[in-house]
Amino acid sequence: MHQVLTRRDLIRAAAAGVSTLTVAQLPSWAFATGEAEEDGRPVPFVDEQPIDPKRPMLKWDDLRDWITPKEHFFDVSHYGTQHVPADSWRLSVEGLVERPASFSLDQVKSRARQEVLATLECSGNGAGADFMGAIGNARWAGARLADVLKECGVNSDAIEVAFWGVDKKKETIRGNEYEQNFARALPLAEAMRHDVIMAYEMNGQPLSVAQGFPLRLIVPGWYGIAWVKWLSRIELRERRLMNRFMARDYVTVRGDRHGDTIRWTESSV
């Protein structure tokens, strides 16, 4: 017999100190229908995913395979979709490297090709009724990031690798406006993993514009915010990148209790 989750259940859970209860963590019976307990009302979970044509999402009922077709893949970007001409596009590698370099798409493709089967999920997936399909599985193919970094020669002072996309927008920082390209960073050890690639193919076909053509960073195990689309610049750094998407947005807040005190800390996703 299925149990019905009511508002009272959620309130009791919250009172008991359960602070991380999310839709994704609820047991399957939480979505069952039935009669509410006396004086209780069922929580109105959405049983049909709303459709927003301006924000493509995975349609769960249409799934027929573990690999998500490109046309069913979700699309999220912060500074708008970018249409980048392949013939004029370049990838620059700079910063703390012995041999700074610039690569055309053909030059990237001339490196050893690696295929990675990985799940891409937006960190906001499940945050609302209209944002329940920001996840998908795909076969990504491209050049290993570590190979390119080794080719350029990583300086011993480097601790982090920052990745910039072509997309940009003016951001307000301390009351002033500055044009900022979208950027994220990885610790050097993560960037050197064998499964981190710069992809130019998805499911055996060239990347679509929405998925980051001509080149996209693929970082299995990290949320989609780290999978930089329309990749155009890589910088080896001796200091942490502290931009909007590393230090202000996309951070988790955690409280650790020490006696009667809770210590709150923020960490990048």
Where do the protein language model's features map onto the residues?
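Generic macromolecular interface patches on structured domains
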Residues: 20-21, 155
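Detector for intrinsically disordered, low-structure N-terminal pre-sequences
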Residues: 3, 22, 42-45
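N-terminal cationic amphipathic segment used for targeting or macromolecule association
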Residues: 12-13, 28-30
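Structured, non-membrane catalytic/scaffold regions adjacent to prosthetic-group chemistry
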Residues: 29-269
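Short hydrophobic alpha-helical membrane-anchoring segments
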Residues: 21-29
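N-terminal secretory signal peptides and thylakoid transit peptides that target proteins
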Residues: 1-18
